[in-house]
Amino acid sequence: MLIWLVELSDKVQLFNLFRYITFRAGAAMFTSALIVFLFGPAIINSLRVRQGKGQPIRADGPQTHFKKAGTPTMGGLMILAGILGGSLLWGDLSNVYVVAVLMVTLGFGAIGFYDDYLKVTKQSDKGFSGKARLGIEFLIAAIAVFFMMKMALASAPHGGTLGSSIAFPFFKEFVINLGYFFVLFGAFVIVGAGNAVNLTDGLDGLAIVPVMIAAATFGVIAYLAGNAVFANYLQINFVPGTGELAVIVGAVIGAGLGFLWFNAPPAAIFMGDTGSLALGGLIGSIAVATKHEIVMVIVGGLFVMETLSVIIQVFWFKRTGRRVFLMAPIHHHFEKKGWTESQVVIRFWIISVGLALLGLATLKLR
């Protein structure tokens, strides 16, 4: 919103700063963190009063989790408030990518909110119907991908088809044009990312830090991919307009830091599906916009690992009646093995940092 003040920069030199994405990304981070810090306590108290027993605790989960009974959920509302505030204030709302990513974030957040609401009111870990939830997620994601694809095709240099193509790391020229089938592929990436983060969110601080790490990584990628000079130097695909997504990433990091203040063990609040679905969808959307969907598998490798552990567990149990892991997602397996919660969380953070660095390395290895 404030970017429009650039038009007055000839009268007020200070407004010229709003021209720079890096400045606005930093300002968005500060703004979103401030919003969460200021309104977080009131939101937590309100949710605690309204929810009573808080988020239901799985009966088959680790014994250490029962002491968390009564902790309110839906903390994603705090995160969404920060992201929305920082993005609306400092982002370019005329940018199609910005609007599409925010649409996915809010849409997935609304789905997660309804899911959390059902779980809290029923005091059950069974919320929104799985098929209905996935169907709505795919619809929201497909609409966003369609508009991002159209934007990428319209702005592609020399009438290229990058917007409807899958790009691969290490090989700039190797792309596969899917045509309109790219909408389905992109929607799958976004929905997969949203639900992968959702599965990861099971311990205090476990999901939010890897989310910030992955978001920061894609913020760098978005900034570079949206800059013709940097994209040409690194031999990555140039996608005009995606640099503006770095501002949203700044808001994500700020909101994430603010939320972590309250989510650090012992957590005063859980983000719930409200936050995890929204954040995962946001990261997946940026990966699709910047044509780094495959790199998403590397950068978000922790989320992929958590998801695969559930898929393997369910598949093998249905097939043989036996379990591969003591409990899934895999972070619970390590708890059952005797790791403390802090050991699991910090070690998974370390894995996230390593995967993020590996993902960034793909930008240079061509």
Swiss-Prot record:
It holds the Pfam family Glycos_transf_4. Signal peptide: none annotated. It catalyses: UDP-N-acetyl-alpha-D-muramoyl-L-alanyl-gamma-D-glutamyl-meso-2,6-diaminopimeloyl-D-alanyl-D-alanine + di-trans,octa-cis-undecaprenyl phosphate = di-trans,octa-cis-undecaprenyl diphospho-N-acetyl-alpha-D-muramoyl-L-alanyl-D-glutamyl-meso-2,6-diaminopimeloyl-D-alanyl-D-alanine + UMP. Its EC number is 2.7.8.13. InterPro entries: Glycosyl_transferase_4, PNAcMuramoyl-5peptid_Trfase, PNAcMuramoyl-5peptid_Trfase_CS. Its cofactor is Mg(2+). It is found in: Cell inner membrane. The chain crosses the membrane at residues 25-45, 70-90, 93-113, 134-154, 174-194, 205-225, 245-265, 268-288, 297-317, 343-363. Keywords: Cell cycle, Cell division, Cell inner membrane, Cell membrane, Cell shape, Cell wall biogenesis/degradation, Magnesium, Membrane, Metal-binding, Peptidoglycan synthesis, Transferase, Transmembrane, Transmembrane helix. It is a multi-pass membrane protein. One of its GO terms (molecular function) is metal ion binding. Pathway: Cell wall biogenesis; peptidoglycan biosynthesis. One of its GO terms (biological process) is peptidoglycan biosynthetic process. GO terms for cellular component: plasma membrane. Catalyzes the initial step of the lipid cycle reactions in the biosynthesis of the cell wall peptidoglycan: transfers peptidoglycan precursor phospho-MurNAc-pentapeptide from UDP-MurNAc-pentapeptide onto the lipid carrier undecaprenyl phosphate, yielding undecaprenyl-pyrophosphoryl-MurNAc-pentapeptide, known as lipid I. NCBIfam families: mraY. Belongs to the glycosyltransferase 4 family. MraY subfamily. This is Phospho-N-acetylmuramoyl-pentapeptide-transferase. It comes from Agrobacterium fabrum (strain C58 / ATCC 33970) (Agrobacterium tumefaciens (strain C58)). The gene is mraY.
